[in-house]
Amino acid sequence: MFEFLHQMSAPKLSTSILRYIFRYAQFIGVIFFCLHTRKDDKTVFIRNWLKWLNVTHRIITFTRFFWVYIASISIKTNRVLQVLHGMRLVLSIPNVAVILCYHIFRGPEIIDLINQFLRLFRQVSDLFKTKTPGFGGRRELILILLNLISFAHEQTYLWFTIRKGFSWRFLIDWWCDFYLVSATNIFIHINSIGYLSLGVLYSELNKYVYTNLRIQLQKLNTSGSKQKIRRVQNRLEKCISLYREIYHTSIMFHKLFVPLLFLALIYKVLLIALIGFNVAVEFYLNSFIFWILLGKHVLDLFLVTVSVEGAVNQFLNIGMQFGNVGDLSKFQTTLDTLFLHLRLGHFRVSILGLFDVTQMQYLQFLSALLSGLAFIAQYRMQVGNG
């Protein structure tokens, strides 16, 4: 087994895991399209029967979850827990409504976006004739593996947090809870993998410019043949065209999925507050499991932040890949057009204009979370001593 993993490259392994994540998203009813392969061309298309099956299934499971959750809230004696659980229930309604709306009304836009991603990966890969096919490198593999760990936790956490014995009723309740929670969390993972993909596209294109095109530009001068100059000119224009297409794809992705990210972040913060309250105030005997659950949600936010930061950094590195372009003024004019585009189209991920997704924001959130948990635990100990 270890020999197999050693022989398998990081890009190929990442591609295999992404294929599993695609099937997982189909299984939980978030993805309603299928992948169709025609020789070297891969496209996605809508399966109408799968879409309406997912819509019906989601309505049924959420209805069951809604009434069971109301019953569990009514028997709780702690007012704070009642409020937090009630907020989670209320917030789950727009999450489910948004998923249903995306399934019914925005399917063609999502299909166009996914096909655009696949087309860009093919075009960037064609620049490297001998490059090993796959997705990214070791950094991307590590982040995808962390996403995979998060998926595994979503499937099993309820089995360890519920103390009652297993039964058919428990299995049904677990499935309804899992179907809702996993679909909400997938918003986080879609944004994480989406911006990770944009970062890979920028990184691969930057690598080609730095290792191939830049050298060709620097060697050219006015004495070069017109055919050679024209060939390099075409490659330069091709790269600039790809930069623009990647940027426009990022805008499409932002418009489609960042509103979903906003809902998922609110839901995630509320869950973290709920779990933190249970850990710091109630002091469950199995609090270690709740600490793992808390760490899982913090990990999800970390993955989104790192993916966004990676894409932003690769975008900012575009201008530094070209260097001196030689003596031909036409190349400098073409690059000036690119640099103007970079200045006008600054790459950033803003959550509805409220804040940008950055490492600084993540660290501030983490600091606030730890301070809040410490305050609640200290208050609990003072009340207990009193």
Swiss-Prot record:
Glycans are attached at N54. The keyword Metal-binding does not apply. InterPro entries: 7TM_chemorcpt. One of its GO terms (molecular function) is ligand-gated monoatomic ion channel activity. One of its GO terms (cellular component) is plasma membrane. Keywords: Cell membrane, Glycoprotein, Membrane, Receptor, Transducer, Transmembrane, Transmembrane helix. The keyword Transcription regulation does not apply. Residues 1-14, 101-141, 191-256, 309-356 are cytoplasmic. Residues 36-79, 163-169, 278-287, 378-386 are extracellular. The chain crosses the membrane at residues 15-35, 80-100, 142-162, 170-190, 257-277, 288-308, 357-377. Coiled coil: none annotated. It is a multi-pass membrane protein. It is found in: Cell membrane. GO terms for biological process: monoatomic ion transmembrane transport; sensory perception of taste; signal transduction. Belongs to the insect chemoreceptor superfamily. Gustatory receptor (GR) family. Gr93a subfamily. Probable gustatory receptor which mediates acceptance or avoidance behavior, depending on its substrates. This is Putative gustatory receptor 92a. The lineage of its organism: Eukaryota, Metazoa, Ecdysozoa, Arthropoda, Hexapoda. The gene is Gr92a.
